[in-house]
A protein has these predicted regions:
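Hydrophobic membrane-insertion alpha-helices, especially the h-region
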Residues: 5-20
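A structural signal for short, hydrophobic/glycine-enriched beta-strand patches
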Residues: 20-174
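A transmembrane-helix-recognition feature enriched in membrane-embedded lipid enzymes
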Residues: 171-190
Length: 191
């Protein structure tokens, strides 16, 4: 029995190191993002009256990206989760327009999705992403998985990382991303 425990622990350690290496290698910005016509801004949990801190960082990154790329259009992705007062994308738009001063004409909405795979599929169905280069903005820990899922959907994305607001959230998020990535690998939906 102890032998089985050691083998399982070794498998966990190897999978954790491999997946964390993938996550960390994907945390960089692609210089080619300059060419992007569309940028998907992936949603995250919202509170009753505002976006979460992690989502605020994504929105600030999106606002900066739009300032630096005057022809780009942002697609705000995110449906309504449990205990959320509205779809994430609606609050994202509200925050960007009201707080950051983003031009509302440059913000499109995808408000039916519940996860990253649905974010991408729904945005692709609504907007001509296959006809143009697109970027994806998400928290740095989430970027590798988001890019791979976009590639699986037939897109050629550039990654633009948003910082994680604090170290405890970063640690918890890396563990959650490990679990999400492992789940996709084990169900055959990754790679």
């Amino acid at each position: 029995m102890a032998q089985v425990g050691r083998v399982l622990f070794a498998l966990f350690c190897v999978s954790f190191v491999c997946i964390q290496s993938l996550i960390i290698s994907g945390e960089h910005a692609d210089p080619e993002a300059e060419e992007a016509q569309y940028v998907l801004v992936l949603g995250a949990h919202i509170l009753q009256d505002r976006p979460s801190d992690a989502l605020i960082e994504r929105l600030k990154t999106a606002d900066t990206f739009l300032d630096e790329h005057p022809d780009a259009i942002a697609i705000l992705c995110g449906g309504q989760g449990t205990n959320e007062p509205m779809p994430e994308s609606h609050m994202m738009r509200q925050y960007m327009v009201d707080t950051l001063g983003t031009d509302p004409d440059r913000l499109l909405i995808e408000d039916k999705s519940r996860n990253t795979i649905q974010n991408i599929a729904n945005a692709k169905a609504l907007y001509p992403l296959e006809e143009s280069r697109c970027a994806v903005i998400s928290s740095d820990f989430h970027l590798a998985r988001a890019r791979i899922l976009m590639e699986q959907a037939g897109l050629d994305p550039y990654g633009v990382p948003a910082p994680v607001p604090n170290l405890p959230l970063a640690a918890a998020s890396h563990m959650r991303e490990y679990c999400s990535t492992l789940g996709l690998i084990l169900t055959g939906r990754y790679f």
